[in-house]
Structure formats: C-alpha cells, structure tokens
Amino acid sequence: MQVSIACTEQNLRSRSSEDRLCGPRPGPGGGNGGPAGGGHGNPPGGGGSGPKARAALVPRPPAPAGALRESTGRGTGMKYRNLGKSGLRVSCLGLGTWVTFGSQISDETAEDVLTVAYEHGVNLFDTAEVYAAGKAERTLGNILKSKGWRRSSYVITTKIFWGGQAETERGLSRKHIIEGLRGSLERLQLGYVDIVFANRSDPNCPMEEIVRAMTYVINQGLALYWGTSRWGAAEIMEAYSMARQFNLIPPVCEQAEHHLFQREKVEMQLPELYHKIGVGSVTWYPLACGLITSKYDGRVPDTCRASIKGYQWLKDKVQSEDGKKQQAKVMDLLPVAHQLGCTVAQLAIAWCLRSEGVSSVLLGVSSAEQLIEHLGALQVLSQLTPQTVMEIDGLLGNKPHSKK
C-alpha cells in the first residue's frame, strides 16, 4: 500500500506557507534534510531542542483517473501521453532517425526535419548507436547543439546492443551497456539520455547483469529511464521480476514493430504487461518501411528506402508474394482514407495511435514535407470510430484474437 506522511499541526506552524512539506527538506549538501555539511534534519529555527514532529502514516489516495490521459499542446495540437505508467510525458508522435539521419538525407535536411518536428510539438527523438555506424547520433547531437533548445523540453532515447566489431562492443554485458552508452553520449554531446533501450535481448548475458547495469547507468545520471526493444513479453516480465527481487530499477517501456500487417505483440501481449507492471509501448514501422503508402505499386522507386544500398532485404520484402498481397490490401484501404479526407499513410499512423498502451509512434521521414503530412494523422485519430476500425479489420482480415 502506498503511504504519505501527514505532518502535525505544531510542526506545520514552524514553517511558512510556501514551505509546508511533509518531512524535513534536504539542505544543499545534506543527505538527511539537515543543513549543508550534515545535521539531523531539524526544522529551521528549531535548534533541535523543541518538540519533535510526529508523523503518521495515512493511506495515499489512488491517482485520479485523468492522470494518464492525453493532453493537447497549446498552439501545436500535439497530444502527449505518459510513457507507460511512468511520470514522463511524451508526444504521441516521435521522430526516429533510422536510415535517414547520417545516411539517406543530408545534414541540412535532417535539421529541417528536426526543426519542423520540434515546432509542431514533437518532443521525443529516437536514435541508436548502430544507426549509420554512429553517424545518426552525431548528426542529431550537432543539430541539438546548434539549436540551443532547452534540454528539459525534449526527450532523447538511444539503443544499445550493436556498437562495434569487437566481441566486447556488442551485446548487453555490463561492460558494453556502460561503455556503449558513454559512447552514445559523446556522439550526442549530451550529459544524459532520457531513455536507454536494450536493442534486443541477449541470451548470452544473465538477466540480473542486464538489470543491474541499467540500474547503474541510471544511478550515475547517464540515463533517466530504461526500456527494451524487440524483447518478448516473458523476457520483459523476467527483467521486471528481477528488478523487484533485488530492489533495482525495472524497464518502463518496450519498443516494438507495429503496423497494419504486424499486430499480435502490440495488440495482444503488451497491453497485459501495461496493466500488470506498467510497461508502455513505443512503436515503430507504422508504414512498414513505406509499404503502406501506395508509392511502391508493384515497383521500387529510386527515392525510397528499398533502393538504398544495403537494404536489399527490404526490396526483396516489397517484391515478395506477401509484399504484393499487402500492397493490394493497401489499395483496398484507399476508399476508407478518401472517406475520411486523408492519405493512406495518415490513416495507418492514426490507426497505430489508437492501440491500448501505446505511448508514442515513431515516424521515419526523409523530408520536412513528408513529416508535416504524417503529423496530419492527429486529425484523423478523432475520426476513427469503432465502425471505421471494424471496417479496416474486415478489409485486412488479420485481427488477432485472444487465446482465452
């Protein structure tokens, strides 16, 4: 049961109206609420000789129902949600840097994209040590430094697993989590990241070592939260249980693939974790690497990701039988999009946002114009009635069903 401290009337009278806190307040260097240099936490002016304050444990009322609700940014229309059941508020649309920053687009275009995102209320920017072999982090860091935005006004997330070629430069060992995160911070030119993600699970590393290492980097001020990416529900639960067993810090969210053709994990597995242990979801690939845009149409344009060197796997996926079937399904969604007055891309992104437990959906764009179009999904979200969602499910024919 959560408790709060109720202060006695006598103790309250010894404090000003602006300083009526329950319990002694830490001094500038005192760990126990006393003045700098030590002390025992006596109230100001108490001298240690007056009556001792009596504290009573009283039940803390549950958080109001609206505590985890969306809020809308003034002037931008951006919606903000809690990251899982943590207190961190993130924009429901975030900006990812995979493929684009340090690779597909120029640094000038990257700056334009980041600026438009920030000015439209996006406060979540995601990257990873492996993206463009570290160039994505460098590009993001250079832009943030040049912009001079308040560090407290945005959230930076990075992911650790693939850092280099050496055996000790990848995985989730304590060594690589600490050294990898320090390398990311150096490239980002930041003192800390808001969230550090384990970029996949590591069967070669004990779970206790992973959780202890993540707790360490948080306690050292290198990160504020930690999460998982592409972990199974059982692995996330194991990490949470390990944290609770040893009084460590548990993960707050999972990064997972989620789009019209990838539904099972985010719609069936993660909501259960959200309700049980408060783990939220940050999802990626809302357009399935551009497949859900109708731009392929049986071919691979030179300007898309599938045509980039090193992404032959994506080209093969687009041209596969499954890829062609999915493209046909996208064409079936065109009438629904037209009825709502939006593009298929906006419809697909809004559809991802309506899933339970999803804190934010990461967007990957190659231009500011594309980003503005995708941000238009916020207006579509309010139009997704249960009837419209049922119509989409009927066209897709892939709605996951509960095992119960």
UniProtKB/Swiss-Prot annotation:
Q: Which InterPro entries match?
A: K_chnl_volt-dep_bsu_KCNAB, K_chnl_volt-dep_bsu_KCNAB-rel, K_chnl_volt-dep_bsu_KCNAB3, NADP_OxRdtase_dom, NADP_OxRdtase_dom_sf
Taking the record's annotation, the residue ranges forming a coiled coil are: none
**Tissue expression summary:** Brain specific. Most prominent expression in cerebellum. Weaker signals detected in cortex, occipital lobe, frontal lobe and temporal lobe. Not detected in spinal cord, heart, lung, liver, kidney, pancreas, placenta and skeletal muscle.
Check the record and name the SUPFAM superfamilies matching this protein: NAD(P)-linked oxidoreductase (SSF51430)
The protein's location, in the record's own words, is: Cytoplasm
What one GO molecular function would you report for this record? transmembrane transporter binding
Catalytic residues at Y131
Q: Which Gene3D superfamilies match?
A: NADP-dependent oxidoreductase domain
Per the UniProt entry, the signal peptide is: none
Question: Could you tell me which residues belong to the region Disordered?
Answer: 1-77
Q: What is its EC number?
A: 1.1.1.-
Residue spans of biased composition, Polar residues class: 1-14
Q: What are its GO cellular component terms?
A: cytoplasm; plasma membrane; voltage-gated potassium channel complex
Keywords of the record: Cytoplasm, Ion channel, Ion transport, NADP, Oxidoreductase, Potassium, Potassium transport, Transport, Voltage-gated channel
Question: Can you tell me which family this protein belongs to?
Answer: Belongs to the shaker potassium channel beta subunit family.
Q: Which PANTHER family match?
A: HYPERKINETIC, ISOFORM M, VOLTAGE-GATED POTASSIUM CHANNEL SUBUNIT BETA-3
Q: What does this protein do?
A: Regulatory subunit of the voltage-gated potassium (Kv) channels composed of pore-forming and potassium-conducting alpha subunits and of regulatory beta subunit. The beta-3/KCNAB3 subunit may mediate closure of potassium channels. Increases inactivation of Kv1.5/KCNA5 alpha subunit-containing channels. May display nicotinamide adenine dinucleotide phosphate (NADPH)-dependent aldoketoreductase activity. The binding of oxidized and reduced NADP(H) cofactors may be required for the regulation of potassium channel activity.
Subunit annotation: Forms heteromultimeric complex with alpha subunits. Interacts with KCNA5 and KCNB2.
For this entry, the protein name equals: Voltage-gated potassium channel subunit beta-3
